[in-house]
Amino acid sequence: MNTPRVVVAGGGTAGHIEPALAVAESLRHRGAEVVALGTTKGLETSIVPERGFELRLINPVPVPRKINADLFKLPFRLLATISQTRKILKEFDTDVVIGFGGYVAAPAYIAAKLQKIPFIVHEANARSGMANKLGVRLGGMGLNAVANSGMPGTVVGIPIRSSLSGDNTALDRAQQLWGLDPEKKTILITGGSQGARSINAAVAEGIDAVLADPDVQVLHAYGRKNSAPEAQERYVPVAYIDDMAAAYAIADLVIGRSGAMTVAENTAAGIPAIYVPLPHGNGEQGLNAQPLVEEGAAVLVADSEFNGEAFSSLAAKILGDQETYNTMVIAAKESGTANAAETIADIIYSIVKNHDRNK
């Protein structure tokens, strides 16, 4: 079998990029050649090169939510982007395309279909998005993180970075990067790659009550476009966390949105969580977290109800009761699917092998 040449399409937010790169890393370890497809508008412009992968750019084609001039331009923009994507697939001599939803995925699926290149559609959320549903309808192989997403396909879980587990130096890095004490209980707060203003507001309101416990410290990723309270002893605000392995290594409790990638990484790390689902979209964030709540690994709080009092009281309840905490840790670890990236890499290699045989 020739060396597989794979294009991974996942851009915009970390929720689309991270699973794509987790699969890309697994493929690279096996000797495959991988190129990432993205746009100039997303986080991939920094994250992908930092991970050592080549990034090819196409024009983003967002779907307007209102009837306006942009809506009438949509077909022409989409055709132009599909043409760009087809050129990239041809130049790279692509064997397989795998998409993870978002603006980049739909042009990738359509271009792969037109080029007669096998393609895979991975849905990370509990409720599938439009681009991925389109991909499966076009003949792509559907892979789901969970059952009953609304998209046909095999359940494989969510691919996560191998560096998030088994990193013996991660705890030391957490101490060096943020001055955190590994002997204290650490709350990791994050609103995802974009931050979350409502969570930030609750932190500002409740941080003093949380820090009243001298055994608790807080690492707060508030988002590059947002602001946070001033740093103080045992409270470390940062705009963005580049080294999530270090953050997870020292964290005892995670508070944040319940995007599919966040939920997958938390459970793989075996960390109890308080999830505050994004109140917009099609409700997929609440659905992402619901199985963890039912299994006892997490608590779910509506965005409108998460304030300073909820922040401080829930954190104290979980971290202050060792039996409750231990039960949540066990439930989180049992819910994880840490081998999804390897499973998907196996599928890609099988497709390439069969495709070579049928040429």
UniProtKB/Swiss-Prot annotation:
Annotated membrane topology: Peripheral membrane protein
Q: Name one GO molecular function term.
A: undecaprenyldiphospho-muramoylpentapeptide beta-N-acetylglucosaminyltransferase activity
Catalytic reaction(s) noted: di-trans,octa-cis-undecaprenyl diphospho-N-acetyl-alpha-D-muramoyl-L-alanyl-D-glutamyl-meso-2,6-diaminopimeloyl-D-alanyl-D-alanine + UDP-N-acetyl-alpha-D-glucosamine = di-trans,octa-cis-undecaprenyl diphospho-[N-acetyl-alpha-D-glucosaminyl-(1->4)]-N-acetyl-alpha-D-muramoyl-L-alanyl-D-glutamyl-meso-2,6-diaminopimeloyl-D-alanyl-D-alanine + UDP + H(+)
Recorded hits in InterPro entries, A to Z, give: GlcNAc_MurG, Glyco_trans_28_C, GlycoTrans_28_N
Its annotated compartments are:
Cell membrane
E.C. numbers: 2.4.1.227
Any one Pfam family here would be Glyco_transf_28
GO annotations of cellular component type = plasma membrane
Q: Which residues form a coiled coil?
A: none
Question: Per the record's keyword annotation, is Glycoprotein included, yes or no?
Answer: no
Pathway assigned in UniProt: Cell wall biogenesis; peptidoglycan biosynthesis
GO biological process: one example? cell wall organization
Q: Enumerate the Gene3D superfamilies for this protein.
A: Glycogen Phosphorylase B (3.40.50.2000)
Annotated UDP-N-acetyl-alpha-D-glucosamine binding sites? 13-15, 125, 161, 193, 241, 285
Kindly state which keywords UniProt assigns to this record, in alphabetical order.
Cell cycle, Cell division, Cell membrane, Cell shape, Cell wall biogenesis/degradation, Glycosyltransferase, Membrane, Peptidoglycan synthesis, Transferase
Entry-linked PANTHER family: GLYCOSYLTRANSFERASE, UDP-N-ACETYLGLUCOSAMINE--N-ACETYLMURAMYL-(PENTAPEPTIDE) PYROPHOSPHORYL-UNDECAPRENOL N-ACETYLGLUCOSAMINE TRANSFERASE 1
NCBIfam families registered for this protein in UniProt? murG (TIGR01133)
Family per similarity comment: Belongs to the glycosyltransferase 28 family. MurG subfamily.
Q: What does this protein do?
A: Cell wall formation. Catalyzes the transfer of a GlcNAc subunit on undecaprenyl-pyrophosphoryl-MurNAc-pentapeptide (lipid intermediate I) to form undecaprenyl-pyrophosphoryl-MurNAc-(pentapeptide)GlcNAc (lipid intermediate II).
Protein known as: UDP-N-acetylglucosamine--N-acetylmuramyl-(pentapeptide) pyrophosphoryl-undecaprenol N-acetylglucosamine transferase
Q: Which organism is it from?
A: Corynebacterium diphtheriae (strain ATCC 700971 / NCTC 13129 / Biotype gravis)
What is the taxonomic lineage of the source species? Bacteria, Bacillati, Actinomycetota, Actinomycetes, Mycobacteriales
